[in-house]
């Protein structure tokens, strides 16, 4: 048997031990975490909707009408009018024929890959894809390859080398969760079309944030359902609620209803959550000012960091990583910020590659300019005198 205690101590010694913090109250920038009042720069609540009064009111009303839980899978009697209306509204929002709700983005990705692929098929993934996409590819049983990060030429070469046998599924993040950069989706879409490959875009961090109406990375690039046949979006980030969906053609969605095990064999999300998400969707569509404010805060943070000599990764999204390199040093910098009542967790291997431990700053429309300036001042104080941190 494995010596689990020794393995845990080794992880701790390398600065890779993970610990949970306990949040009291709502998901807002000002939080009480482990009994300490902090300003958090680590939430994915990009538009500040998790605590929006209209979203909360819709959740309460939905619970009053439908109860606390769905009670069954969608294919038994857990699929309510609220779920059905949300699916129709998400399909219209993303300009796809149909949409299908899943309990989480992780389950959505696993379900699609399992439903479409078998042992004689091929799955190709960006090297920096989210863990759920990697697991989806591996667990599908298909022949698995990774192409160089955001490198369309490498993908094209790998697809060309597959011959004519088997289905091909290409999986990519729309916005990469640890780097904040966008995948070259127009190039990937063109290559997939040329090689008759499915393309799935996981737009967990683009939906609600990018595009004129907030419809995400595909709207940002102007890509149609024909160009990107499979869109996966999550609802627990910019929408501020929970769950996920897959959007695409009528035939795709019906295939998933019949064959996606993570859809068929699990209880539906609570209908009250579907109602809360419908309210969030209306806000996403109606209040473009939230995206405008978010873009303004991102620009302010990047300009301020540049003035301080802090080199950030090339990202124009709310994800603003500061690569430190060493995991222990990243933890130390995170602790220095926490001492100043700022919560910016260190992200370490295996979440990111070895030697690229980082602080992952995430911004929200709920932040104020004063809070962003406070973070910049704290970074300046914490990093002053350190030659190795953040390439200063």
UniProtKB/Swiss-Prot annotation:
Positions annotated to bind substrate: 18, 130, 351
Origin: domain of life: Bacteria
The protein's annotated pathway: Cofactor biosynthesis; biotin biosynthesis
Gene3D superfamilies in the record: Aspartate Aminotransferase, domain 1, Type I PLP-dependent aspartate aminotransferase-like (Major domain)
Family according to the record: Belongs to the class-II pyridoxal-phosphate-dependent aminotransferase family. BioF subfamily.
Record HAMAP family: BioF_aminotrans_2
Protein name, entry field: 8-amino-7-oxononanoate synthase
């Amino acid at each position: 048997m494995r010596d689990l205690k020794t393995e845990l101590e080794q992880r701790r010694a390398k600065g890779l031990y993970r610990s949970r913090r306990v949040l009291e109250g709502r998901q807002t920038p000002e939080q009480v975490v482990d009994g300490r009042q902090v300003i958090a720069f680590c939430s994915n609540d990009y538009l500040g909707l998790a605590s929006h009064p209209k979203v909360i009111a819709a959740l309460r009303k939905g619970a009053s009408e439908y109860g606390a839980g769905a009670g069954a899978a969608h294919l038994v009697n857990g699929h309510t009018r609220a779920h059905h209306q949300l699916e129709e509204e998400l399909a219209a929002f993303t300009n796809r024929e149909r949409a299908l709700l899943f309990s989480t983005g992780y389950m959505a990705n696993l379900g699609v890959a399992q439903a479409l692929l078998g042992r004689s098929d091929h799955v190709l993934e960006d090297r920096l894809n989210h863990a759920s996409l990697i697991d989806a590819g591996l667990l599908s049983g298909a022949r698995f390859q990774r192409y160089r990060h955001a490198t369309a030429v490498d993908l094209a070469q790998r697809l060309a080398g597959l011959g004519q046998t088997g289905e091909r599924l290409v999986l990519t993040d729309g916005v990469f969760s640890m780097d904040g950069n966008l995948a070259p989706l127009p190039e990937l879409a063109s290559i997939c079309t040329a090689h008759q490959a499915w393309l799935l875009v996981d737009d967990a961090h683009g939906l609600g944030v990018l595009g004129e109406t907030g419809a995400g990375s595909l709207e940002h690039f102007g890509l149609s359902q024909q160009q990107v046949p499979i869109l996966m979006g999550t609802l627990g980030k910019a929408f501020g609620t929970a769950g996920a969906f897959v959007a695409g053609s009528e035939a795709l969605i019906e295939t998933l209803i019949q064959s996606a095990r993570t859809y068929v064999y699990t209880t539906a999300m609570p209908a009250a959550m579907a109602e809360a998400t419908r309210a969030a969707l209306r806000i996403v569509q109606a209040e473009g000012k939230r995206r405008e404010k978010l873009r303004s805060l991102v620009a302010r943070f990047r300009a301020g960091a540049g003035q301080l000599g802090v080199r950030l990764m090339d990202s124009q999204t709310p994800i603003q990583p500061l690569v430190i390199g060493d995991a222990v040093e990243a933890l130390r910098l995170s602790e220095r910020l926490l001492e100043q009542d700022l919560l910016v967790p260190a992200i370490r291997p295996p979440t990111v590659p070895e030697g690229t431990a980082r602080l992952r700053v995430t911004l929200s429309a709920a932040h104020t300019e004063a809070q962003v300036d406070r973070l910049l001042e704290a970074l300046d104080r914490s990093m002053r005198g350190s030659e190795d941190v953040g390439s200063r």
